[in-house]
């Protein structure tokens, strides 16, 4: 019988929070606040033999920064990865409130970092269709530059128009 705790693993989708976000939201509680610190997750990694993990942004700068800025989100992701080099990696964030040129410039700077594996797009959190023109240009840039794009989708059939439905994703 295989002991699951001893098998080496990669956790491909985790959410952690920077200390200032945790501190500012302590009274609200919730799993991201109560267990979202890097130290908490490193203990889990050690306990369950997780060799590396990929920190995912939310595409919502209000979740990973106190100044609600995607550049601060990236710095927070880098700081978290730096607490466990070669164990914690991350995906770049995107904030569609920025114009497309600014977004591409930010991404070009960020993907040069060794801890960045690619870009995460969470269309539901941005409330913008995954097959919309803004993302279309981001996908063109990513394809041209051989950048991995992770699309977060949880289809919801009760919606008339789901921005991250498989039908929309296949259009990308």
Feature-to-residue mapping (PLM):
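Histidine/acidic-residue-rich catalytic or RNA/ligand-binding cores of hydrolases
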Residues: 20-26, 160-169
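Alpha-helical scaffolding within the catalytic cores
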Residues: 35-44, 71-78, 104-106, 166-170
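Generic structural signal for hydrophobic
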Residues: 44-45, 110, 142, 172
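Active-site gating/metal-coordination segments in enzymes
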Residues: 67-160
């Amino acid at each position: 019988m295989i002991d699951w705790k001893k098998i080496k693993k990669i956790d491909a989708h985790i959410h952690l929070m920077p200390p200032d976000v945790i501190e500012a939201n302590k009274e609200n509680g919730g799993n991201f606040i109560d267990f979202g610190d890097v130290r908490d997750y490193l203990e889990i990694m050690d306990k369950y033999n997780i060799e590396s993990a990929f920190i995912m942004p939310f595409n919502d700068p209000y979740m990973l920064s106190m100044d609600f800025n995607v550049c601060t989100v990236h710095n927070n992701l880098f700081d978290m990865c730096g607490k466990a080099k070669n164990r914690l990696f991350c995906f770049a964030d995107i904030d569609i409130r920025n114009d497309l040129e600014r977004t591409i410039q930010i991404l070009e700077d960020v993907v040069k970092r060794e801890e960045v594996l690619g870009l995460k797009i969470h269309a539901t959190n941005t409330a913008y269709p995954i097959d919309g023109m803004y993302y279309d240009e981001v996908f063109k840039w990513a394809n041209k530059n051989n950048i991995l794009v992770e699309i977060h989708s949880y289809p919801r059939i009760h919606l008339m128009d789901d921005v991250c439905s498989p039908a929309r994703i296949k259009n990308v």
